[in-house]
């Protein structure tokens, strides 16, 4: 019986593909490699798709069409093409694709619950407004400055103690702890590290969720394979979501009990964090958008993945580049010593006076963008750059490839922060206004966490440079630059270093 069902599905797919081919052969479609029956171009795409898209674009042009299984796709690989899709045709390409098995499973069987993946509509607009006003506005960034400072000091103190003892550290793991604690305190008013087991679990969960969301799942593209779960995704998704539920359900339950007691005693909470705001909406019958527990948990998942993984990975890539380019590292250290000195640690207010450090961060984001692919979907058919783009076409803007385009970047594969400095000032904003440099995307669906990343990444990178020399364990003094799959751009291998204290910001240690 299963064989008969599979045979019917295969025949149906071939017939559908033929009808689609006949229909589209009359249109002016983008150039495309030769496709295979049923799988289309899936055989050309590895688990790290942005690299394969880049290689294909060198042969087929800046805008090319691919069929990933039964899903029609278009890949934009230059700044000019990105601008057409993300600015000229922004409204038509404001939706996210809806077939992602991992996202749907992690988001409690509704992709709409995850703000980052929700369709462009009332819920997405409401959640973005909530995120920007209650968590990431300038007012909230200022209010949470002491939190970021405290967590940075704890991070440096922890690494400093290991350095004094001559212990090696997993650089990325330490950064994940730092980012996790910052996001947790901003969102939940508590550190995940207040409970060591919970901290370790949350770090693993954030990494697992980011990896699952970004993995290339063949079932997303060949619909009749979903019941078979050939890659074992469903089991991993359920296991990860169940573990996430255990942690977050406990936090929500504890907060609800605190709120109940405060209400009984008439005690007013001095400051409401993001969880309080979400629970207020959950309890308010007249709220503009009614949030249930699944909405709240999905939003917390969104914030942790976007706020934790992106910042930690960006700092880790920056240090990998600096270790491999010691002249750049030394120049950055000299700038910090000249501007800040050695008697105190760098603060966020110093960053404006450290143009070379800012250039290092920008150059890191050029080569290692937090999101290597901007993924959208067309709401209706359109003509872009002279090509017919049908409705429901999945768009991949290859940010990773755009950062390596020799038409915009001289010697694009070299790490050269100087390219961002002109007349002593940094050039190019990171928020998507310059289409050859869009590390956080562009337009109304620009990553909302860009403002937090720009607060967290430069200052912590500066302090790491200022306080320590870094002695690489193994690797012949060089860090490998291999990537692995994920929704962000994680490193394939950890950076293991011995932090050699250079200045002592903690005289009691």
UniProtKB/Swiss-Prot annotation:
Any Pfam family the entry gives: p450
Keyword presence, Lipoprotein: no
Q: Which residues does heme bind?
A: 447
Major localization listed first in the record, in broad terms: membrane
Provide the GO biological process annotations.
defense response
Q: Which PROSITE patterns match?
A: CYTOCHROME_P450 (PS00086)
Identify the keywords attached in UniProt to this record, alphabetized: Heme, Iron, Membrane, Metal-binding, Monooxygenase, Oxidoreductase, Plant defense
This entry's comment on induction and repression of expression is:
Up-regulated by methyl jasmonate, elicitor treatments and elicitor peptides GmSubPep, GmPEP890 and GmPEP914.
Q: Where in the cell is it found?
A: Membrane
State the SUPFAM superfamilies in the record: Cytochrome P450
Cofactor(s) needed, names only, are:
heme
Provide details of activity as a function of temperature.
Optimum temperature is 30 degrees Celsius.
UniProt similarity note = Belongs to the cytochrome P450 family.
Q: Which protein is depicted?
A: 3,9-dihydroxypterocarpan 6A-monooxygenase
Name its species: Glycine max
Gene name per UniProt: CYP93A1
